[in-house]
């Protein structure tokens, strides 16, 4: 027996130790004692007994505390004790008892209870009469003894309990508060129609835990009490009292009129705000208040709060353990007050508490309605109208005076049902509500929509407005299916009801929708449809002045918007096609035509939007004219002169012949084409001769023969003769005289118009005219007529100078010797002084910009450019350039300045109107200029660096005496300090950013140095109270990270400043919410010479203990070794032993005041690359550049700098925000393309990386795009998967972008499969991307936030192209509202979705799974996957580039290709790749891969072997003509091409000259087949051609030495056997590659090597899917389609030449646009020409399987070697291209050579084709500039079209091998989630 006096010294001094007792981490691991009993042994002693717990423990701790607040007494007992006697007790005193079992550092939960000696004796006496044992108590359920009171009154009440949840209570005591609340609620009859209980918790901000109407049963309320969470924060009781008045005692919260209102406050301290007014407001509202104070509560404050009398309404206890002692008294008081209040309410108010009646609604509109009612009986003070939407929403209310019986409800939502309740408010109560519903009307919509003034690119919309509308929203989009981007939206104000819609597509039907807007709400739509006009073609084509080599075309103009015309004219026989573009004229003369030839002409109108349909017609040129006026004169006895008049300027030569009439030999002479006479000598005297003459023209056509008779004479008189033009040689009788006729001129033409001149041309009909008089007069007659005389042999005249843009009448009159002939007149008009067009600004820089324009249609003499600064005063400057220049680089401009630019066209008669525009240079200036460390004689300035600045000039100037200091700094220096300043002086600090020789404008700031110090007054010292636990910030509520602080503890800090760092850490960590494994874990390292771990990540699991540990950190001292500390954090703290967790953010915060004495860059950079986030805080003398190197990017979020340790408060909030945002991210940080992004590298997570893929069944590594990126082939049923909890343990974010780079294979099934999806544990899909190879659609699916399954499917031409066998880059952009698809960096569609819900992490994620699969026995589709990432942002798709795709790679903006090879090296190639693993040997234990052996020498060329089985196809060749496969679907409209004529007479159109970038054009003129054209140089990558002839294989090199037997290594990456290919074909392909490398087109042609889908080993392949029709390629010689051969390897392509004459048409291709016009007028159909170049080769025979090679010897065991280098240039790369290497090619000596069959599978990318136009001139802008630069220092533009020499020579055979796998085992396994979590280390090796 123990005496109380003996054990009294063992007890502790204060019961507060019990209240503050913190259960250890191990609590609960030791079982507690049970069956606690009491027995009185004498009047002051009690025996305590209990049942020992199970398990091992060391002893007991017994605690006894008097309820009156005395000492807590403690007793330690052995583990064998089960009884103890406590003496010296007071009989009528209550005692609290706790018994705890403990073992080492672990303690059990306490068995606890309360007792009083008198109560024990009373129960003992009672039990004797009832034969019961009242001493038994349940220690596990500490219900207060004797609290058996239950309120049984029928009266009901609304009780709201307000609980203090501030930090001062603590989590342990809050459990006691819950127990008190549970006992309190249990005393009342709780129910929805009985007493209702609500509860609010408060600290710094109150919150409703549940309303009065939240729970309908007592059990539900008690369950809510037991789960009440602890809030934490400050103590603002007044705010909380106001809060419950406004929120808890409301009808919508469950408060009932006519029911007692009770408020019970529980608090443990004095309020930090005023409580008197809020408490009075509650009491005035009829709410009876009870106040319960615990521990440190202010009794006076409690009395101010509670209702009277204080004796029954105020309770105060010394500790939380004694709260249950007041439950009975409190519940009895509340119960009696409820009964009394009910009597008062019923007795005094019941008669007057009638509710209003007869609820009526009226004046209903879309935004409100009126509510009316009949008055309530009695004296009503107010009426309260409560209303809210039936579908849910925040209730609102309107209060009106008691005399009113109506209220208007405003600002409601349209077409919404509202619940209405009207309450009568009396002086101390409210009536029941009068309830009803009403629905608002729909918003009024616009009406009478009219669409008019329709053109090809615009229309106007007009509608009737709506009263009350705040504006209108107009949506318009093409009616045809298109992209979401095609829809346009315009918002206008309420005053406008008419709008012009421009920028429309021609000949397109548009849907126009008008919404009336009422704020953010929109009315129902008003919709109309209208079709834009087609682009107007010209009309009324006429042909005139048709000669043998020219014809004049005339047509009526198309419209005022036409930019010009394109004229195509072709010979009907299809042998020649020509094309010319002219300006906006209506006439043009075709020249250099062929005589007697029919021509077909098509004229297209050219617009900015494209070209119109053609206007067509035809004409036939005339026969060539014979010479005219053949005469013989100047006859003598042996000669005479023959003269004639030429009839054309294109005569090549003449044949002149003569023969005597009486017989003799004929003689002939050939004369030049410019001859017009000849003297024939050596004739017989007095003899008549027949003289004949014919003209031979340039095109080798001959004219008719013209003949004349001439004779020699005896005398001296010349005999003139007349001329007879016949086809035979005839003569007329000579006449002695010449007849002269007064005829006018013929064919008067006025052409070559300029702004100041006209050319007049005519044919002379009579050579007897001596002169011609040319007169011209303006058509208006406002100028005097002028005349010019010209000789009779002249037939052309240039009239100048004339007025511009003026019509003239020109008249020609022949003048004869005896008078005038007949006059002929014609009109002509000079051109206007047209201004330049389309002013463009580009190449903006800090001191220059480029101006470009389009030339006007009128020929100019040059251009005058005038430019002037808009804001900076100064004169206007000007410059002149020639007429062949249309771009100019303006230099020496001011930075960041707007300039007005004017361009004038210069003509001989003056200048045109100005083409004006505004341009602005880039701003070269710093930002965020600020000052710091301002002292009496010094100050510092800092700024944000300019990204292009190379230096800074910083000037400080005194505003008092003007003294200056100036310094020049480097481009990376963001701050500078000035010294030797004057105290108390204002200074101006200016910073000029400099870029080379350019200096930007000054950025300035004013600052005043500190004045001389004065003696500050002394003040008494104060002692700061200990810091309280800070509340968690809202931004940190979701934070979950491993956070490590690295604190500088070097000597430079000092004790005082180190304490400030500790305070800063205390505040920063205090802002976090949950601490421990389920929240944020915190560790701290203090560093100087050596780092010291203050505590690890897993050291503390509560904020209280963590903050206490921070305060205990002691100052270290030493030097500054920051790099060593960072490395220590990585090696010691970021480990599993220290508590690091996977898949959550890892954050380091470095705090330092100086420069590190070791290297910090390397280790911080390495950790950042691994996903760690760094924050760097520099103080005072810290090195800013070092902080930037430590901190993550962007530095604005991760680097902080303060002047001193007192300035931490300036950055605290911002740092906490950024750290918590980083810690709250669902996604880890990864590095991608040099950017630090939040996301997931899914290829790594699935093991699809070079070091891991070999462990995955059914996966092989192959070369991807450019033959340098690795990609992975997922073979059939590979079913690559991983558990979701390893990949996305926190699920997916709400916004993210999925990125794939993949290729569909020929053996990919035609049924749907999931490219990637997440399944739950029942294998049900949750989210994923589905491709339907048969339907050519893409579908995204997930579950939305409501749990509904949702899918969006995309289709169309952009979607279909991903199924045609090329690599494509796919972005699936998912946001809370939309799903967007981007293919090859081009948007393909966007659709609306709901926000996603949560996903289960208990399932798996799978690649390629077939949709029809069910359960664990799944099937998967084969495909090639090169890239798979998920980036946690929707903006990534806009930032990402298609650098991995050959056709879209931009070398200037893309990183260099990995291991890109060059053809400029010597013929000898680099060291070969590592050798492959050997054949199967003796199976042994699992070993490592051996070291690669050296490359053996090349063996001699071998003989052609027996054809073997077909290998996988090799890399893709450039797009050529493929073997025709199955018919494809109708093609989409192509890019701009040449529109063809239908009919038999059509001919191929020629390529156009370089044109401007325009809209998509029409197809050119098809024509007849011509002769085979020469092969052109290589063109762009196109459709694969046919394979070449297989070459012969080389013999195997000598076998290496056999290594010692060893265990086989892990499964290697051996690929399938390669393919042998024709060396001639290979070399041709390689030469294309090399030449294009030289030409800068490496990106486009590297795809030759990679885009061939590999197939499993087979001797036969099936035809691939039909190819997608692409855009027309660059015009080149098009060859005829070859006959289909066997399917096989796509061979080397045809080599299209540079744009030139159009080649012959090929076989029928993809369906194009319909031709235009009607049947051609004339001409028989042409015959088909022979096939052109680039045709498919003949098929090779299928090979038979070769013999199996012998098994290799087992190699010696070795460590795993590094992966082999990527592909390299073959030694003959510049004459052929070796495609092997890099991935372990099989080198077995007995591998047979196989002959590849043809493959009809098309693999081409439509994006790789040219747009159907010649490439524009290349300049430094983004638009074509067909003119040279005006500055000599810049290169002239050149035509960027590839020119290659065809490869024709024979070359040696080269063996090609495609890396891949030659076998794999199809895996059929029941995959469970559990087995997927472990490595398949013992996977069976696949059979050979």
Curated annotation (Swiss-Prot):
InterPro entries: Collagen (IPR008160), ConA-like_dom_sf (IPR013320), ECM_Assembly_Org (IPR050525), FN3_dom (IPR003961), FN3_sf (IPR036116), Ig-like_fold (IPR013783), TSPN-like_N (IPR048287), VWF_A (IPR002035). Residues 1468-1520, 1524-1579, 1580-1618, 1664-1715 form the Collagen-like domain. Residues 1239-1434 form the Laminin G-like domain. Wide tissue distribution; high presence in dense connective tissue in skeletal muscle. One of its GO terms (biological process) is cell adhesion. Gene3D superfamilies: 2.60.120.200, Immunoglobulins, von Willebrand factor, type A domain. Residues 32-123, 355-444, 445-536, 537-627, 628-716, 744-833, 835-925, 926-1017 form the Fibronectin type-III domain. Glycans are attached at residues 138, 1398. It comes from the Eukaryota. Residues 1-28 form the signal peptide. Lysines at the third position of the tripeptide repeating unit (G-X-Y) are hydroxylated in all cases and bind carbohydrates. Prolines at the third position of the tripeptide repeating unit (G-X-Y) are hydroxylated in some or all of the chains. Residues 116-138, 1699-1711 have a biased composition (Basic and acidic residues). Residues 110-147, 1472-1620, 1654-1767, 1817-1841 are annotated as: Disordered. It holds the Pfam family VWA. Residues 1664-1786 are annotated as: Triple-helical region 2 (COL1). Residues 158-330, 1042-1215 form the VWFA domain. A motif (Cell attachment site) lies at residues 1489-1491, 1617-1619. Keywords: Cell adhesion, Collagen, Disulfide bond, Extracellular matrix, Glycoprotein, Hydroxylation, Repeat, Secreted, Signal. Homotrimer. An adhesive role by integrating collagen bundles. It is probably associated with the surface of interstitial collagen fibrils via COL1. The COL2 domain may then serve as a rigid arm which sticks out from the fibril and protrudes the large N-terminal globular domain into the extracellular space, where it might interact with other matrix molecules or cell surface receptors. This is Collagen alpha-1(XIV) chain. It comes from Gallus gallus. The lineage of its organism: Eukaryota, Metazoa, Chordata, Craniata, Vertebrata.
């Amino acid at each position: 027996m123990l005496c109380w006096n003996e054990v009294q010294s063992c007890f502790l001094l204060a019961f507060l130790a019990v209240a503050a007792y913190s259960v250890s981490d191990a609590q609960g691991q030791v079982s507690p004692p049970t069956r606690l009993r009491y027995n009185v042994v004498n009047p002051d002693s009690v025996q305590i007994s209990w049942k020992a717990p199970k398990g091992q423990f060391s002893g007991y701790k017994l605690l006894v505390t008097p309820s009156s607040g005395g000492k807590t007494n403690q007793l330690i007992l052995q583990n064998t004790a089960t009884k103890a006697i406590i003496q010296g007790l007071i009989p009528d005193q209550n005692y609290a008892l706790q018994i705890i079992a403990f073992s080492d550092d672990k303690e059990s939960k306490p068995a606890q209870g309360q007792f009083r000696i008198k109560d024990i004796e009373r129960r003992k006496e009672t039990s004797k009469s009832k034969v019961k044992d009242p001493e038994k108590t349940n220690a596990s359920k500490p219900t207060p003894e004797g609290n058996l009171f239950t309120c049984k009154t029928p009266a009901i009440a609304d009780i709201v309990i307000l609980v203090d949840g501030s930090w001062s209570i603590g989590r342990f005591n809050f459990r006691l508060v819950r127990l008190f609340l549970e006992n309190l609620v249990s005393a009342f009859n709780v129910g929805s129609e009985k007493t209702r209980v609500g509860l609010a918790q408060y600290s710094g901000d109150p919150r409703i835990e549940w309303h009065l109407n939240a729970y309908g049963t007592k059990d539900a309320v008690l369950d809510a009490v037991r789960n009440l969470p602890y809030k934490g924060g400050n103590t603002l009781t007044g705010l909380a009292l106001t809060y419950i008045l406004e929120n808890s005692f409301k009808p919508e919260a469950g408060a009932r009129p006519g029911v007692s209102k009770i408020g019970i406050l529980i608090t443990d301290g004095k309020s930090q705000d005023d409580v008197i007014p809020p408490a009075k407001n509650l009491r005035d509202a009829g709410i009876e208040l009870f106040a319960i104070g615990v521990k440190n509560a202010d009794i006076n404050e409690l009395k101010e709060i509670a209702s009277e009398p204080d004796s029954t309404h105020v309770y105060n206890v010394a500790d939380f353990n004694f709260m249950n002692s007041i439950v009975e008294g409190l519940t009895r008081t509340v119960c009696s007050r409820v009964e009394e209040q009910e009597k008062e309410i019923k007795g005094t108010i019941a008669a007057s508490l009638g509710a209003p009646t007869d609820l009526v609604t009226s004046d209903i509109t879309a935004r409100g309605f009126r509510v009316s009612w009949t008055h309530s009986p009695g004296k009503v003070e107010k009426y309260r109208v409560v209303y809210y939407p039936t579908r849910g929403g925040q209730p609102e209310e309107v209060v009106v005076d008691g005399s009113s019986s109506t209220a208007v409800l405003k600002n409601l939502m349209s077409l919404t049902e509202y619940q209405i309740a009207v309450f009568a408010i009396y002086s101390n109560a409210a009536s029941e509500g009068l309830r009803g519903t009403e629905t608002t009307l729909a918003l009024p919509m616009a009406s009478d929509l009219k669409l008019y003034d329709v053109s090809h690119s615009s229309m106007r919309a007009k509608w009737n407005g709506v009263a009350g509308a705040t504006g209108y929203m107009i949506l318009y989009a093409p009616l045809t299916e298109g992209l979401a981007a095609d829809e346009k939206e315009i918002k206008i104000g309420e005053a406008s009801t008419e709008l012009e819609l421009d920028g429309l597509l021609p000949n397109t039907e548009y849907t126009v929708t008008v919404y009336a807007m009422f704020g953010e709400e929109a009315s129902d739509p008003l919709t109309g449809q209208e079709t834009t006009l087609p682009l107007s073609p010209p009309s009324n084509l006429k042909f005139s002045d048709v000669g043998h080599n020219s014809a004049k075309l005339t047509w009526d103009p198309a419209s005022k918007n036409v930019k010009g015309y394109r004229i195509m004219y072709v010979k009907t026989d299809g042998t020649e096609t020509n094309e010319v573009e002219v300006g906006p004229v209506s006439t043009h003369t075709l020249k250099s035509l062929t005589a007697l030839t029919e021509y077909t002409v098509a004229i297209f109108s050219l617009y900015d939007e494209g070209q119109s349909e053609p206007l067509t017609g035809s004409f036939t040129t005339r026969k060539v004219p014979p010479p005219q006026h053949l005469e013989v004169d100047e006859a003598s006895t042996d000669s005479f002169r023959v003269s004639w008049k030429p009839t054309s300027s294109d005569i090549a030569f003449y044949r002149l012949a003569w023969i005597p009439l009486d017989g003799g030999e004929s003689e002939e002479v050939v004369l030049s084409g410019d001859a017009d006479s000849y003297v024939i000598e050596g004739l017989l005297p007095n003899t008549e001769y027949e003289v004949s003459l014919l003209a031979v023209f340039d095109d080798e056509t001959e004219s008719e023969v013209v003949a004349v008779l001439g004779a020699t004479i005896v005398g001296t008189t010349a005999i003139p003769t007349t001329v007879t033009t016949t086809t035979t040689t005839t003569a007329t009788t000579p006449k002695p005289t010449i007849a002269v006729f007064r005829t006018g001129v013929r064919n008067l033409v006025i052409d070559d118009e300029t702004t100041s001149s006209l050319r007049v041309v005519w044919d002379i009909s009579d050579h007897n005219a001596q002169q011609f008089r040319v007169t011209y007069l303006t058509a208006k007659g406002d100028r005097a007529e002028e005349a010019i005389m010209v000789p009779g042999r002249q037939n052309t005249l240039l009239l100048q100078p004339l007025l511009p843009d003026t019509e003239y009448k020109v008249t020609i009159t022949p003048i004869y010797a005896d008078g005038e002939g007949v006059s002929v007149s014609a009109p002509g008009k000079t051109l206007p002084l047209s201004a330049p067009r389309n002013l463009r600004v580009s190449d903006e820089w800090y001191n220059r910009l480029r101006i470009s324009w389009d030339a006007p249609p009128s020929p100019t003499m040059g251009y005058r450019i005038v430019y002037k600064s808009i804001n900076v005063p100064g004169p206007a400057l000007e410059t002149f350039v020639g007429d062949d220049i249309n771009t100019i680089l303006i230099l020496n401009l001011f930075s960041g300045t707007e300039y007005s630019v004017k361009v004038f066209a210069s003509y001989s008669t003056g200048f045109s109107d100005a083409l004006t525009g505004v341009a602005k240079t880039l701003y070269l200036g710093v930002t965020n200029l600020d000052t710091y460390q301002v002292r009496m004689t010094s100050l510092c300035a800092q700024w944000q660096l300019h990204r292009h600045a190379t230096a800074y000039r910083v000037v400080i100037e005194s505003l008092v005496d003007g003294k200056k200091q100036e310094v020049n700094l480097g481009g990376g220096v963001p701050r500078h300090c000035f010294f030797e300043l004057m105290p108390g002086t204002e200074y101006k600090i200016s910073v000029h950013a400099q870029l080379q020789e350019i200096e930007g404008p000054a950025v300035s700031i004013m600052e005043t140095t500190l004045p001389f110090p004065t003696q500050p007054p002394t003040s008494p010292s104060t002692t700061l109270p200990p810091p309280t636990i800070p509340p968690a910030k809202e931004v940190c509520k979701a934070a979950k990270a491993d956070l490590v602080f690295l604190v500088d503890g070097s000597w430079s800090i000092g004790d005082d400043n180190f304490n400030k760092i500790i305070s800063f850490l205390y505040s920063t960590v205090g802002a976090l919410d949950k601490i421990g494994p389920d929240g944020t874990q915190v560790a701290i390292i203090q560093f100087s010479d050596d780092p010291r771990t203050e505590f690890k990540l897993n050291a503390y699991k509560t904020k209280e203990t963590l903050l206490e540990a921070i305060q205990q950190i002691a100052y270290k001292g030493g030097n500054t070794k920051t790099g060593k500390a960072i490395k220590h954090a990585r090696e010691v703290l970021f480990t599993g032993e220290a508590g690091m967790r996977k898949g959550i953010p890892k954050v380091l915060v470095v705090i330092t005041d100086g420069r590190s004495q070791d290297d910090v860059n390397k280790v911080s950079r390495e950790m950042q690359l691994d996903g760690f986030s760094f924050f760097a805080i520099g103080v005072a003398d810290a090195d800013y550049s070092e902080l930037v190197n430590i901190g993550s990017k962007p530095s604005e979020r991760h680097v902080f700098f303060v002047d001193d340790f007192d300035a931490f408060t300036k950055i605290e909030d911002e740092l906490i925000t950024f750290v918590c945002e980083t810690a709250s991210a669902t996604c880890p940080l990864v590095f991608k393309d040099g950017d630090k992004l939040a996301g997931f590298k899914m290829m790594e997570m699935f093991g699809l990386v070079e070091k891991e893929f070999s462990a995955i069944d059914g996966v092989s590594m192959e070369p991807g795009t450019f033959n340098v990126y690795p990609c992975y082939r997922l073979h059939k049923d590979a079913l690559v998967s991983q558990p979701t909890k390893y990949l996305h343990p926190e699920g997916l974010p709400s916004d993210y972008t999925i990125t794939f780079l993949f290729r569909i294979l020929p053996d990919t099934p035609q049924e749907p499969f999931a490219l990637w999806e997440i399944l739950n544990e029942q294998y049900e899909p949750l989210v994923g991307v589905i491709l339907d190879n048969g339907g050519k659609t893409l579908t995204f699916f997930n579950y939305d936030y409501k749990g509904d399954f949702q899918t969006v499917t995309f289709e169309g031409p952009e979607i279909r192209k991903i199924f045609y066998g090329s690599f494509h880059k796919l972005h699936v952009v998912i946001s809370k509202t939309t799903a967007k698809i981007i293919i090859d960096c081009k948007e393909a569609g966007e659709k609306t979705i709901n926000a996603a819900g949560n996903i289960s992490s208990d399932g798996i994620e799978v690649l390629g799974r077939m949709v029809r699969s069910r359960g664990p026995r799944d099937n998967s589709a084969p495909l090639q996957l090169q890239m798979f990432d998920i980036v946690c942002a929707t903006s990534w798709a806009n930032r990402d580039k298609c650098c991995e795709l050959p056709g879209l790679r931009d070398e200037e903006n893309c990183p260099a290709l990995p291991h890109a090879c060059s053809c400029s090296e010597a013929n000898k190639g680099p060291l070969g790749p590592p050798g492959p693993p050997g054949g199967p040997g003796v199976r042994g234990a699992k070993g490592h891969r051996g070291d690669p052996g050296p490359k053996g020498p090349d063996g001699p060329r071998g003989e052609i072997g027996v054809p073997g089985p077909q290998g996988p196809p090799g890399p893709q060749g450039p797009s050529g003509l493929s073997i025709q496969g199955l018919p494809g679907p109708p093609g989409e409209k192509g890019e701009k091409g040449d529109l063809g004529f239908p009919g038999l007479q059509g001919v191929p159109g020629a390529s156009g000259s370089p044109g401007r970038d325009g809209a998509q054009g029409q197809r050119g003129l098809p024509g007849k087949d011509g002769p085979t054209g020469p092969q052109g140089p290589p063109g762009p990558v196109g459709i694969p051609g046919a394979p070449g002839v297989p070459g012969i294989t080389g013999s195997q090199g000598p076998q290496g030495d056999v290594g010692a037997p060893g265990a086989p290594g892990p499964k290697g990456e051996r690929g399938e056997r390669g393919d042998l290919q024709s060396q001639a074909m290979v070399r041709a392909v390689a030469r294309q590659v090399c030449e294009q490398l030289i030409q800068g087109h490496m990106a486009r042609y590297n795809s030759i090597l990679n885009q061939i889908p590999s197939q499993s080993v087979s001797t036969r392949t099936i035809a691939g899917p039909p190819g997608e029709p692409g855009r027309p390629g660059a015009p080149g010689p098009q060859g005829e389609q070859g006959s289909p051969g066997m399917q096989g390897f796509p061979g080397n392509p045809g080599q299209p030449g540079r744009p030139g004459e159009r080649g012959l048409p090929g076989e029928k291709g993809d369906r194009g646009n319909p031709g235009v016009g009607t049947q051609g007028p004339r001409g028989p159909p042409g015959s088909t020409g022979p096939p052109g170049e680039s045709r498919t080769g003949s098929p090779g025979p299928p090979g038979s399987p070769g013999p199996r090679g012998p098994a290799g010897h087992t190699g010696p065991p070795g460590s795993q070697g590094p992966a082999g280098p990527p592909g390299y240039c073959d030694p003959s790369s510049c004459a052929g291209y070796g495609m092997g290497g890099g991935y372990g090619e099989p080198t077995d000596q007995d591998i047979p050579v196989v002959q590849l069959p043809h493959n009809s599978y098309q693999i081409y990318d439509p994006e790789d084709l040219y747009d159907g136009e010649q490439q524009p001139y290349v300049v430094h802008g983004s638009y074509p500039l067909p003119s040279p630069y005006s500055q000599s220092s810049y290169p002239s533009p050149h035509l960027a079209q590839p020119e290659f020499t065809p490869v024709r020579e024979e070359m040696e055979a080269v063996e090609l091998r495609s890396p891949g796998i030659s076998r794999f085992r199809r895996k059929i396994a029941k995959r469970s989630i559990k087995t997927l979590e472990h490595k398949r280390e013992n996977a069976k090796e696949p059979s050979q």
